[in-house]
Every structure is written in structure tokens, then in C-alpha cells.
């Protein structure tokens, strides 16, 4: 039982590692929270620091979700891995290492899915990038993909999977509430695939 509690804390702490902040300060000498949207996530990193930093942060944020979800498997615990994944996402959104001001749950949630259901992860990746290249809205693509994740979990019939996806989708949409208003007002920034970045 003690091991379980400790690993839940480890999962939260893994999620709390603010890679966008670390990459910004160490690699570029800036606090990314003071630039762009101020968000500690991949999208703001791409827009503020460029492609290289954006890819590094996004991959790192995905992997921390994957690693956290793997903890009960690695330590042979009889507890559903998605609970540990949720702890990591909570850490990503409210990181203790960055004054509880984190990202929007997208990449780390993807990492959770990568560990728990690679097939669903692959399907959602196709959905996300199809929407992104069609609409050029990262926020809209993220929210719609989150809803599709819920639908996929319902189709699976796995009750814990359904609960976890509902919680993650709810968190993703909640963290994008400001984006929803900007999309409606047509002031939401679009991804610019032709723009040269660092």
C-alpha cells in the first residue's frame, strides 16, 4: 500500500516536470510563461521558440504520461494504470514545480494513451493531424480529438477507460475554454505550416 501511494506521488511529480520551462530557460534564456500564451505546453513552445524546441517539449510531455502510466506495470501492482496516468496529467496541468501553472493536458494525455492503448493512440493521432491540417486550429483539433477519445472508450466497453477518458477530455476542454471564445470570435491564432521557424 505504501508503495502504491509513493508511486502515485511519483506519477504526479513526473507530470509536474515543466519541460517547456526547462527548455526555454536552459536553451533560450527565457521564461516561456512570459511569452506567447504563457502556457507551459508544446503549442506555445512551437510558436515562441520554434520547431526544434516545440518537438522536444511535446515528445517529453508525451513520454512523461507514458512513463507514469507504466509505473504499476513496472512494479507489478494490481492497480489500473490509467489512475497513474491521470495523476501525471494532473501534475502537467497543475505542476508543483511551476507554481501550479502548467499545460493544457493534451500531450501528456496522449502519452497515457500511448501506454494503455497504442491502437487508440494511433487512431486519435490521425484524427488530430487531419483536423489540424484542415482547420489549422491546434486548440479545436485537441478538443475534438478529446471527444473522439471518449467515444473510443465507450466503444471499448472498458468502464475505467471510459471514466478516465471522460476526465481527461473534460480537463482538455476546460483548459481550452478561453480558446473556445477566440474561435467563436475568429481571433484564435492558426498554425502556420509555411512559416520558417528555428
UniProtKB/Swiss-Prot annotation:
* TM region positions: 4-24, 71-91, 113-133, 147-167
What GO CC annotations are associated with the protein?
plasma membrane
Native species of this protein?
Answer: Bacillus cereus (strain ATCC 10987 / NRS 248)
HAMAP family documented for this protein: PlsY
Q: Gene behind this chain?
A: plsY2
**Disulphide connectivity of cysteines:** none
User: What is its membrane topology?
Assistant: Multi-pass membrane protein
Task: Report the protein name in the record.
Answer: Glycerol-3-phosphate acyltransferase 2
User: What are the GO MF terms of this UniProt record?
Assistant: acyl-phosphate glycerol-3-phosphate acyltransferase activity
**Keyword Transferase, does the record have it?**
yes
Superkingdom in the source lineage: Bacteria
Q: Main EC class of this protein?
A: transferase
Query: Part of which pathway?
Result: Lipid metabolism; phospholipid metabolism
**Assembly information from the UniProt record:** Probably interacts with PlsX.
Q: Where is it localised?
A: Cell membrane
Amino acid at each position: 500500500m505504501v508503495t502504491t501511494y509513493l508511486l502515485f506521488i511519483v506519477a504526479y511529480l513526473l507530470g509536474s516536470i515543466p519541460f517547456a520551462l526547462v527548455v526555454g530557460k536552459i536553451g533560450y534564456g527565457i521564461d516561456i510563461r512570459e511569452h506567447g500564451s504563457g502556457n507551459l505546453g508544446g503549442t506555445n513552445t512551437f510558436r515562441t521558440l520554434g520547431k526544434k524546441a516545440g518537438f522536444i517539449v511535446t515528445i517529453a510531455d508525451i513520454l512523461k504520461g507514458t512513463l507514469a502510466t507504466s509505473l504499476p506495470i513496472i512494479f507489478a501492482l494490481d492497480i489500473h494504470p490509467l489512475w497513474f496516468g491521470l495523476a501525471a496529467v494532473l501534475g502537467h496541468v497543475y505542476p508543483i514545480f511551476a507554481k501550479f501553472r502548467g499545460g493544457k493536458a493534451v500531450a501528456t494525455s496522449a502519452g497515457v494513451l500511448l501506454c494503455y492503448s497504442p491502437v487508440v493512440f494511433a487512431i486519435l493521432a490521425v484524427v488530430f493531424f487531419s483536423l489540424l491540417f484542415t482547420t489549422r486550429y491546434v486548440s479545436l483539433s485537441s478538443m475534438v480529438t478529446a471527444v473522439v477519445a471518449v467515444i473510443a472508450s465507450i466503444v471499448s466497453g472498458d468502464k475505467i477507460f471510459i471514466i478516465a477518458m471522460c476526465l481527461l477530455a473534460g480537463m482538455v476542454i476546460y483548459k481550452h475554454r478561453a480558446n473556445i471564445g477566440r474561435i467563436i470570435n475568429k481571433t484564435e491564432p492558426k498554425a502556420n505550416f509555411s512559416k520558417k521557424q528555428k
